[in-house]
From Swiss-Prot:
The gene is accD1. GO terms for molecular function: acetyl-CoA carboxylase activity; ATP binding; carboxyl- or carbamoyltransferase activity. Keywords: ATP-binding, Cytoplasm, Fatty acid biosynthesis, Fatty acid metabolism, Lipid biosynthesis, Lipid metabolism, Nucleotide-binding, Transferase. GO terms for cellular component: acetyl-CoA carboxylase complex. Component of the acetyl coenzyme A carboxylase (ACC) complex. Biotin carboxylase (BC) catalyzes the carboxylation of biotin on its carrier protein (BCCP) and then the CO(2) group is transferred by the transcarboxylase to acetyl-CoA to form malonyl-CoA. It is found in: Cytoplasm. This is Acetyl-coenzyme A carboxylase carboxyl transferase subunit beta 1. InterPro entries: AcCoA_carboxyl_beta (IPR034733), Acetyl_CoA_COase_Trfase_b_su (IPR000438), ClpP/crotonase-like_dom_sf (IPR029045), COA_CT_N (IPR011762). Residues 1-257 form the CoA carboxyltransferase N-terminal domain. Coiled coil: none annotated. SUPFAM superfamilies: ClpP/crotonase. Gene3D superfamilies: 2-enoyl-CoA Hydratase, Chain A, domain 1 (3.90.226.10). PROSITE patterns: COA_CT_NTER (PS50980).
Amino acid sequence: MNINDIFLKRKKRWGIINRLRDSEEQADGSLTPSRRIALISDDKSFRELYAQVKTGNPNSFPGYEQKVEANRLKTGQQDAVVTGTCRIGGVKTAVAVMDKRFLMGSMGIAVGEKITRLTEYAMKRKLPLIIFAASGGARMQEGLFSLMQMAKTTAAIEKFKDAGGLFISYLTNPTTGGVSASFASLGDIIIAEPGALICFAGPRVIEQTIGQKLPEGFQHSEFLLEHGMIDMIVDRKDMKQTLSKILKMHVNTGGEA
C-alpha cells in the first residue's frame, strides 16, 4: 500500500467518525457546526458558501501545513468556521458557525475571509446575519496576518450595520482573545450560552498579572449578563425559537430578509 492509499484510507475513516460525531454533542459538551446548524435551521434549508476558502502558511511556520491538514481530517472542515445561508422560522439568514475542534477555533486568514465575505453577501442581499463564536483567539502561526483579521472583520460588520443590517452575535464556550475583541462583541443583540467563558485574556493570566483573586464566575456569561455586557443567555434547546422570534420582529419592523 503506497502513501496515497494510506492517506485516503485515513481520510475515509475520519469521515465516518465525523459523521457519527456530528449527530451528537462532543465529549466537552460543545456542538459541531453541522449539529448546531441542524438545531437552528428549517429542514434542508442550509446552503454552504465559501467552502473552498483555505488558509496558507504566510510565515512559513514549521509544521503548520501538517497541523492544518491533520485538523481537516479530524473535523471534516477546511478551517475553523462554516458559513452559509439557511431559513430560521422561515426567515432567510446568513449564518457562520465556528468550530473549536479546528485549532481551537483560532482566527486566521481563512476564517477572517469567510466571515468578511459572508457579511458582504448578507449586506448585498439584505439578510440578517448570525455568527456563533467559539474561539481561542487569533491564530499564532499566521502572526500579523491573523491579527489583521480583527480589523478586517470589524470593518465589514460595522459597514453591514451602518447599512441597516441586523447582526446577532451568539457567544459559545469559549469565546476569547482576538475573536472576543473584534466581531463577536459587535452584535446588535449579543446572546450567550449558559456558563460560556467570554474574555480577552483568561482569568489565570489576569490573576498572575494583577496579583489578585478574581470574583467567582468572572468572565462567564452569567457574570457578563449581570454587568450589562451581553443581552441574554439562551439555552440550546431554546436557540431556534429565540432566534426565530428576533428575526421575525426584525422583518415585521422594516428589516428585509
